């Protein structure tokens, strides 16, 4: 008697296998399709690409990639490339090319403000209390920063064994390493960097402009240098330090918070972290801001030590919330620019939390054929495998930690 069920199962399996192979071929095809951006579909955090053959891709970013000056304007690409220019007052500065948030740095330290952010007609500027040395700015573009990241990635790949660092730096690594999908989704000009070496004894400063934020890295060569990091804030604003050590910059007339400095993260060369406290003193002509860091941390630290506050306006939009939970820890390192996953320093178990606030919703009738979360390793990884689990309860990055949101609790995170 013929086993029709067996034949039917065999045919179904064959069709499934063929479909899987076809899907893999199509995936490879569209991964390497150059694609053309559909500019009319832009949103603040989203780009759309037409890949041909009636296939489209939406790339959702964690922060704005587009800006517009008013509601009715078309979305423009943010370009934070730093360009040399001269202000109306004759000061030679570096200014970002295209953004609703305007950032300026002196081409050479000149006793004036080290940095300024202008948005919605208001400008917030600051500098060290001590006069900085006349150090020249060293600016790098987003493309240069991306190439540096690709060089580090290439050095871990077998195909580049035997290549010198110099040859990697001069190579078109994006073409050699990334798919067309990765290349079209990477908006390099979103980021730029500017560094002043040794502006004060033992103190260097590095600024990274990222979308609609400025990250300030104050780099200490030794413990004594901390005393030189006192910041001079203008009396044009009122200030408040929150319980979470955030600095609120307020309009004097309305009391509205118009700029904000996130809780300053502090880390040493070995990756050990803590948070800095912020202390304000009214000096009459200006407001004095000091960073207070645990003396035990400073004594045990492997130098250099970096203090890295992030400054932005209150209009800054972030499309994701993320943070790291350290087992048994109360810390809330949500201002860090990375997640820790796995064992930190070989002992502390860490879990990352990540959620998108807004996703790209396709038109009715469209079929979603794939979704990818793109992340990259910063350091310390011994494995490329990361497990993802559904989070079952709401959380806020500024408030969540292991003690109030245990990820081992299956009512918080699925198992």
PLM features: what roles do these ranges have?
Residues 2-314, 346-347:
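Residues that cap or anchor secondary-structure elements
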Residues 223-228, 348-351, 361-372:
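Extended extracellular/luminal ectodomain segments enriched in beta-structured repeat modules
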Residues 225, 234-238, 359-362, 378-382, ...:
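Acidic glycine-/aspartate-rich tracts in secreted/extracellular proteins
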Residues 229-235, 356, 366-380:
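A short beta-strand element within beta-rich, extracytoplasmic domains
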Residues 276, 282-292, 337, 403-415:
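Cysteine-clustered segments with highest specificity for TGF-beta superfamily mature ligands
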Residues 295-299, 357-362:
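Signal that preferentially marks extracellular ectodomain short beta-strand elements
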Residues 306-361, 396, 410-412:
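Flexible, small-residue-rich N-terminal segments that precede or flank a structured functional core
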Residues 377-415:
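Beta-strand-rich interaction/scaffold domains
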């Amino acid at each position: 008697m013929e086993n029709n069920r067996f034949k039917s199962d065999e045919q179904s399996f064959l069709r499934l296998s063929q479909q899987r192979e076809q899907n893999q071929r199509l995936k490879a095809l569209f991964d390497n399709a150059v694609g053309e951006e559909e500019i009319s579909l832009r949103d603040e955090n989203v780009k759309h690409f037409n890949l041909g053959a009636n296939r489209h891709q939406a790339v959702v970013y964690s922060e704005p990639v587009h800006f517009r000056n008013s509601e009715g304007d078309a979305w423009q690409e943010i370009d934070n490339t730093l360009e040399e220019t001269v202000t109306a007052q004759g000061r030679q500065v570096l200014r970002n090319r295209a953004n609703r948030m305007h950032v300026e740095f002196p081409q050479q330290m000149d006793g004036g403000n080290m940095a300024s952010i202008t948005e919605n007609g208001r400008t917030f500027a600051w500098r060290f209390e001590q006069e900085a040395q006349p150090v020249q700015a060293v600016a790098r573009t987003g493309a240069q920063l991306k190439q540096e990241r690709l060089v580090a990635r290439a050095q871990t790949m077998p195909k580049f064994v035997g290549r010198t660092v110099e040859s990697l730096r001069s190579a078109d690594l994006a073409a050699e390493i990334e798919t067309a999908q990765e290349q079209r989704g990477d908006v390099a000009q979103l980021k730029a960097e500017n560094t002043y070496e040794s502006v004060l004894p033992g103190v260097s400063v590095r600024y990274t402009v990222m979308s609609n934020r400025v990250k300030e890295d104050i780099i200490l060569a030794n413990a004594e240098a901390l005393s030189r990091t006192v910041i001079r804030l203008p009396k044009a604003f009122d200030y408040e330090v929150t319980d979470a050590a955030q600095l609120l910059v307020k309009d004097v007339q309305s009391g509205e918070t118009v700029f904000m400095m996130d809780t300053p993260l502090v880390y040493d060369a070995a990756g050990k972290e803590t948070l800095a406290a912020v202390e304000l003193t009214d000096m009459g002509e200006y407001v004095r801001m000091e960073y207070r860091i645990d003396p035990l941390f400073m004594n045990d630290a492997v130098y250099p030590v970096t203090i890295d506050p992030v400054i932005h306006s209150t209009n800054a939009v972030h499309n994701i919330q993320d943070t790291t939970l350290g087992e048994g820890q109360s810390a809330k390192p949500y201002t860090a620019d990375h997640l820790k996953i796995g064992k930190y320093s070989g002992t502390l178990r860490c879990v990352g939390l990540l959620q998108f606030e807004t996703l790209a919703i396709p038109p009715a009738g469209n079929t979603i054929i794939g979704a990818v979360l793109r992340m990259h390793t910063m350091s310390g990884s011994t494995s490329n495998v990361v497990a993802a689990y559904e989070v079952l309860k709401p959380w806020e990055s500024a408030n969540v930690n292991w003690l109030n949101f245990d990820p081992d609790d299956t009512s918080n995170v699925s198992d």
